[in-house]
Amino acid sequence: MKQYLRSSVLVIGGAEDKVHGKEILQRFWHCAGGTDAIIAIIPSASREPTIIGDRYVSIFSEMGAKDLKVLDVRDRIQGEDKDYQEYVEKCTAIFMTGGDQLRLCGLLADTPLMERIRQRVKLGEVTLGGTSAGAAVMGHHMIAGGSSGESPNRALVDMAMGLGIIPEVIVDQHFHNRNRMARLLSALSNHPERLGIGIDEDTCAVFQKDEYIEVIGKGTVTIVDGQAMSYTNHGKVAAEDPLALHNLRLHILGHGDRYNRKTHQPMAGIVE
């Protein structure tokens, strides 16, 4: 069986397969340690945390995980819970569910629980997965909401502070499924130094310790690199006026493709 890095961060575009092959969740489970996995599930983004937490417990239990715990954080004081912190200290993986990314950040940001999660991820001690809202929070800057399907403009996107787990990225999810290219470009117009990552449903960008992003799943991962952006009218036009952005680099990556975050170069996957 292929060995996967425990230090991986799996950023999922939402609506991942939970019934049939469950390819993305299987990858998370393997990275977590398979039958030896110790998995913390954080459903705090959801309006129904008990239901969604139990659903993922059932999925990972069916795969063979024996040690799972739902960290049901519903107010900020629970971010100081010693039992939760002790479980995060010993677990091999943490999974953040979908829901509302503002709610998730409001509950977890700057808590002792989140600080320890961030430290363990940075040290490569634990696998982290996040889907939908759990993916949106990964960067320092976060897309908190907005609209779809228009020309890029500043009014199209609402920004907030994320959890800073992968600080250099801005993530959008349900990407092509909800026509969100324009709002990702709108976000990047004010933060061209960040790497824009748009992830389709049932698709995952696997951030690996070796600086590579690997794509798995049924859709694509869109990468917008604004590092060489030569011009934007972001500060010169009204909020609802169209934005101009010059000299962006665009990559559309499919299953098996990779992207090097250091060299900013894509690599084609091996066709089997």
From Swiss-Prot:
Pfam families: Peptidase_S51
NCBIfam families tied to this protein: cyanophycinase
Active site per UniProt: S132, E150, H174
Reaction(s) catalysed by this chain's protein: [L-4-(L-arginin-2-N-yl)aspartate](n) + H2O = [L-4-(L-arginin-2-N-yl)aspartate](n-1) + L-4-(L-arginin-2-N-yl)aspartate
EC number: 3.4.15.6
Gene3D superfamilies: 3.40.50.880
Protein's organism: Geminocystis herdmanii (strain PCC 6308)
Functional note: Exopeptidase that catalyzes the hydrolytic cleavage of multi-L-arginyl-poly-L-aspartic acid (cyanophycin; a water-insoluble reserve polymer) into aspartate-arginine dipeptides.
GO molecular function annotation: peptidyl-dipeptidase activity; serine-type peptidase activity
Family: Belongs to the peptidase S51 family.
GO terms for biological process, alphabetical: proteolysis
Encoding gene (name): cphB
Keyword check for Protease: yes
Entry keywords, A to Z: Hydrolase, Protease, Serine protease
Protein name per the record: Cyanophycinase
